[in-house]
Amino acid sequence: MATGPPTLALVLIGAISVLWGLNWPAMRVASVELGPWTFRAICVAIAGPGLLVIAAHRKEPWWPRRMAWPRIALLGLSGVTGWQLLSAMALTRIGGGAAAIIGYTMPLWAALISALWLRERLDLRRAGALLLGASGMLVLFRGGLAGLAEAPLGVALMLGAALCWAVNTVATKAFSWDIGVIALSGWQLVLGGIPILLAWRILEPDPDLSRLTAAGLAGVSIGAQWTVDGLPLVILVFAH
């Protein structure tokens, strides 16, 4: 995958920030009303096949070579199964704002994983940037740490989700791909969504749609749309 111009990267980062900000409060409502498994099952069931249809319609290379399937499975298990489930479960225990900030520890973990896996040098500039980012997160959390201490499982789940996202990002960068970004995102969602769909049928009862409020329905819609739009954007920005 070729690196795009810096201006494009900045625009994409801005788009991710807006989508991310809209996504978390809505996702929390949907996760609480429907249950985390049901909510995520709906998102991946819509987004995965939808992205593959879009890739085929755009005549983008979309069928991976045989050697690529284990790599895509790794991406799916980390970036879809791990990230989607852990973050949805975290949202039933902590607020959307706190979850979003914890989720944004991903670059910290990605930098450490890249140093170990890709042998990328963690020089003074990068270390300083990571330290500055971590300090900024602590400032955002100021005054709310006591509340998070009362929900340690929610914090642990969200940290696990951020770690899964970091593994997905570094793995995407580590391998070469002969399919496009949209198709790669779609196959991740299809393969990573299979465990979610199976667990949903086993662990969670049929959803009571009568409990779904207008806010919950909006949360499902925004969550599914973010899954469609967000994963390709994340790959374009962070995995280069």
Task: Give residue spans per PLM region.
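Glycine-/small-residue-enriched transmembrane alpha-helix faces in small-molecule transporters
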Residues: 1-41, 147-179, 183, 194-198, ...
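Loop-to-transmembrane alpha-helix entry segments
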Residues: 43, 63-70, 100-103, 119-139, ...
